[in-house]
Regions:
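C-terminal active-site subregion of NodB/CE4 polysaccharide deacetylases
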Residues: 4-6, 14-17, 21-121
Length: 121
C-alpha cells in the first residue's frame, strides 16, 4: 500500500528516457517532474533516484544531487563505506532468491542468496 510506512518509493524519471541522450533542460524536467508526481501521489518526500537503464554522467549526477539524497545504477554489486552515493551499485532480487522449495518466503534462503552474491563479486 502507498500509505504503508514500510514501503519506500524512489524516482526514475517520467518517461524512462535515456538521460545521457537528452538535452540538459529535458533531463532536469524529467528528474524534477518524476519527483513531484510521486510526492503528490504518495504524500511523501522522495529522496532516492535510479537512473533509467543505468545511464548517467557527471552532469546528470549533479542534477540528481540537487534534489535527492542518493541514486543507484544498474551495476550489480554491494555498497561499501567509500561508495559514491550518487552511483550506488545494487543487487537485483527475484523470487528464487527469497523463497524455499514450497514457494514460501524464507529469510534463510534470502540470507544465503546474498552470501552467494557476495562471494560471486
Amino acid at each position: 500500500s502507498i500509505k504503508d510506512p514500510n514501503t519506500f518509493f524512489g524516482s526514475h524519471t517520467v518517461n524512462h528516457m535515456i538521460l545521457t541522450n537528452e538535452q540538459t533542460n529535458v533531463v532536469k524536467d524529467e528528474i524534477s517532474k518524476s519527483k513531484e508526481i510521486i510526492e503528490k501521489e504518495t504524500g511523501r518526500n522522495i529522496l532516492h533516484f535510479c537512473y533509467p537503464n543505468g545511464n548517467y554522467n557527471e552532469g546528470i549526477k549533479k542534477i540528481v544531487a540537487r534534489s535527492y539524497k542518493s541514486a543507484c545504477t544498474t551495476r550489480a554489486g554491494f555498497i561499501s563505506k567509500g561508495s559514491d552515493i550518487y552511483s550506488l551499485n545494487r543487487i537485483g532480487i527475484n523470487e528464487e532468491m527469497v523463497t524455499d522449495w514450497r514457494g514460501n518466503f524464507s529469510k534463510y534462503v534470502f540470507m544465503f542468496s546474498l552470501f552467494i552474491e557476495s562471494v560471486r563479486r
